[in-house]
A protein has these predicted regions:
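Conserved short strand/loop->alpha-helix "switch" segment adjacent to the catalytic nucleotide/phosphoryl-transfer site
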Residues: 18-48, 54-64
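C-terminal beta-strand of the catalytic ATP-binding
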Residues: 130-136, 143
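Glycine-rich GHKL/ HATPase_c ATP-binding element in histidine kinases
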Residues: 64, 124-128
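Glycine-rich ATP-binding loops of the HATPase_c
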Residues: 113-120
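Glycine-rich/acidic phosphate-handling loop/turn and adjacent ATP-lid/helix
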Residues: 74-103
């Protein structure tokens, strides 16, 4: 299940990358059945988003919180949200531009039929929302899936 796998990913990130607990990482994860392949891809996606938040949202030893939510939306489509209460994006910045992290997030999201949307979070910080309509659906491997 996605929730069990992501809980382990978040625990690992919290233990190894949060600068001694200065930044808290929380998960609000619904049980969604997924294949091992989808769980792995989702774990890489979440890892990239959380790592980006750790890298950019909390400069100058600022403390804060990152919350990862995976739950069905109103149409029962899995929705991934990664929200931080950090400094947010500077005016004129575009998280979707060209950084390697953004490219990775876009590519991994696309594997689930999704696209990342970046917006200011309520109360400050940044929230990334990705609707994942293909998560948990059985897919056949195509030549495009093979590196």
């Amino acid at each position: 299940r996605a929730d069990e796998f992501l809980a382990a990913v978040l625990e690992d990130l919290a233990e190894t990358q949060t600068d001694g607990g200065r930044i808290a990482v929380h998960g609000e994860l619904s049980p969604i059945e997924v294949s091992a392949r989808d769980a792995t891809t989702l774990g890489i996606l979440v890892g990239e988003l959380v790592t980006n938040a750790l890298k950019y949202a909390f400069p100058d030893a600022r403390s804060g919180t990152i919350t990862v939510t995976l739950a069905p939306d109103d149409e029962d489509v899995p929705m991934l949200r990664v929200k931080d209460d950090g400094v947010g994006m500077r005016e004129g910045d575009d998280a979707t531009e060209s950084g390697l992290g953004s490219v990775i997030v876009k590519q991994l999201s696309g594997q689930f039929g999704g696209e990342p949307h970046y917006a200011p979070a309520d109360g400050g910080g940044l929230e990334v929302r990705i609707r994942l309509p293909e998560l948990g659906r059985t897919r056949t491997t195509t030549k495009d899936d093979i590196l």
